[in-house]
Amino acid sequence: MREGIRSFIDGWLVAVAVGAVGVVGLCGAKTVSQTDLGSLQSSQLGPVDEAQAALSSARQAKAQAQQRLQQAQSSLKVAQPGQQSAQASIDEAEARLAQAKQGGDPAAIAQAKQALKVANDYKVEERDRVAYLQREIDAADAELSATEKRIDLAKAKLEQSRLEALREAKSPAANKYQGWEFDKAVADRGRDYASAKSEADKAQAKAQRSFDAWQLSKNQVASEKGLEPARGGPGARPMPQGSPVEP
């Protein structure tokens, strides 16, 4: 009885091990060997050249996304002290108003009240500026993640194009590969990229709304100071460089 149970367990463990090896094999990256590809003429590599160009474009987009993230982080560091400066302006304006009230001059009081209003509005502007830059960092980070998924997709498409080139050239080496495995890799990477791009689009929308709020408060302060409003206004946020697009 014990030997029967032991034999059953041993057989089950072997089956599990074999199955695991099969799963690992299916989940591994599907690639076409350079040796097989090297048997083709350059004129037979059209699909490969196009896929390689798409991969290069995806890598360039990632570099741009990294640069945008760094710029947003640097801008936030510069902007953060502005909130302290705004509070200092409020404190100064409040002191002037108190002094004006003691003097009893209506004109001086009105002027001090206006200065206090401008100082408070300036604080709102600085708050909105920091909030926008924080959203900009989130958007840049999401964009960077999307470009990484785009690179993964481009790599899968590159391998798929290599197999396609072998098949079009009627190379016997093409029979060594299972086309469905390459198709599955492209489909899986495509879903990952689509999900990441959706998150990046949502982050971009949030950054745009924060930018619009900042522009409104900025224009409010400019109007009170008799200055020209910010060019463009709400909705004029420049589109970031290197936005993830379908390769």
Language-model segments: residues:
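Bacterial N-terminal signal peptides that target proteins for export
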Residues: R2-V16
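Hydrophobic core
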Residues: A17, V21-G25
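Extended amphipathic alpha-helical heptad-repeat regions
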Residues: S33, L37-G242, P247
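Bacterial signal peptide processing site
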Residues: C27-V32
